[in-house]
Amino acid sequence: MRIRLVVSFCAVAILSCGAHAGVQGASAPTDAASPAATVLGEAVHTTDPETLQEAILTPLLDHYAAEHGIRAELAEINAFVEHLQQGLAAEGLSAEEGLTPEETAEIQTMRNDMARAIIRQWKINKALYAQYGGRIIYQQLGPEPLDAYREFLEQRRAEGAFRIQDPALAERFWRYFTDESIHDFMTPGGADAARAFKVPPWEDTP
């Protein structure tokens, strides 16, 4: 059961990384004189809410991770990749079958990069939850401390770390963190919430 969960988890991660790259590469109308937002002193020019969310969250969370010494360790990355390979083998799959050594190396690099990103994000979420508490929602790549994110962002906004000048974009940005109807919450005090940040999801067992 654990191996099947690991395979599903990593498959979603690969798709998510592809979608993430697509968002980064998407162009949006800009107005050099009127940025939609500023983040850590940098102007953000976009009319797309998803691009805005990424442009704000990425530097703020990078800064948070640096402040708290959050990173993926080599042993954790290796364990993640090993779980993935075990899961693929259990399903009778082999990503390297029929590939050249160069292609195999590229796949290994992709796995390591994916593992590093997912592990780091899980650790950031764990740290935010430990600091702010609140409710947790179910997400494809693991538990997400939604209330902690909102408090973190409200604090950073009050400190002047970011500002959204466009009222319409601001409303759509904050909706993700304030509209409960669009999320699936773990029961506060329930089993899922209790174990959410005790065991990394790629090592979870039923």
Please state what every model-predicted region is.
Residues 21-115, 206:
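N-terminal targeting/tethering segments
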Residues 9, 47, 68, 80, ...:
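Residues in flexible loops and secondary-structure boundaries
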Residues 1-53, 58, 147-206:
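Short, low-structural-confidence N-terminal segments
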Residues 113, 117-174:
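A contiguous, mid-protein "functional segment" used to position or interact
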Residues 14, 21, 69, 132-133:
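Extracellular/secretory pathway and lumenal proteins
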Residues 71-84, 88-99, 129-143, 185-206:
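Contiguous hydrophobic segments
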